[in-house]
Design a protein with these regions (language model features):
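Envelope-exposed proteins and targeting segments
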Residues: 10-12, 37, 108, 117, ...
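Hydrophobic beta-strand residues in large extracellular and virion-surface proteins
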Residues: 2, 119-121, 155-157
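Short, solvent-exposed recognition patches
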Residues: 61-151, 161-164, 168
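Gly/Pro-enriched, hydrophobic low-complexity segments
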Residues: 1-62, 136-137
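Short, gly/Ser/Thr-rich active-site loops of penicillin-recognizing serine hydrolases
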Residues: 47-78, 177-183
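Short, low-complexity, Pro/Ser/Thr/Gly-rich segments in the mature regions of secreted, periplasmic
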Residues: 166-182
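Short, well-ordered beta-strand elements
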Residues: 24-26, 151-160
Length: 183
């Protein structure tokens, strides 16, 4: 059982086979212990020996696995926004500006992680008259919070955290002062 110290993250209940040490089930639970999402193995077919292709793969020279910091080097682009609050353990792993495929509009993007959960934060200018004022959606463990602030900036946070946490992160997005460094 992995129990978060704060209520701004989900907890995990891990079910591991005692003999094989394989992960059989993962329950993601909220602060009250209610099931939010579950991943479950339903069938395991153990073989006396590995398949030939697996033996070949095991003998292959493969590149070393990348650490998160190497896969997503620290902020690549300076954005005009920063976060004034993050849940404990989270940090910005990557950030950039790109165009959304669906609208061709530019969006500032930040990828956050605590090593277990990844979150995406999108910030873009929109016409406040045409934008949806606020959206709060949760499907399983994934929350999506999106709102347009008073100056016509749409802020969207997506990830496997409670909706209240996603909302608090979105509300913490602030413009950088001209001479302020990126966090």
């Amino acid at each position: 059982r992995l129990v978060p110290k704060e209520a701004d993250k989900y907890g995990f209940v891990l079910w591991v086979d005692e003999q094989s040490h394989l992960l059989l089930r993962v329950d993601m639970v909220d602060k009250e212990g209610n099931l939010v999402e579950q991943v479950l193995g339903v069938d395991l077919d153990r073989q006396p020996a590995p398949a030939p292709w697996l033996v070949t793969l095991a003998r292959s020279k493969l590149p070393d696995a990348l650490a998160l910091e190497d896969a997503y080097p620290a902020p690549q682009q300076t954005l005009s926004w920063h976060l004034t609050w993050l849940p404990g353990g989270f940090k910005v792993l990557s950030q950039d500006r790109h165009q959304l495929v669906s609208t061709s509009l530019p969006v500032d993007y930040m990828m956050l992680s605590d090593g277990v959960v990844d979150l995406s934060v999108y910030v873009s200018r929109v016409d406040p008259k045409q934008a949806v004022r606020q959206q709060l959606i949760r499907q399983g463990a994934t929350s999506l919070v999106s709102f347009v602030n008073e100056v016509g900036v749409e802020i969207t946070v997506v990830g496997e955290v409670p909706t209240e946490t996603a909302k608090r992160i979105a509300e913490s997005v602030q413009p950088l002062a001209r001479n302020e460094a990126v966090q």
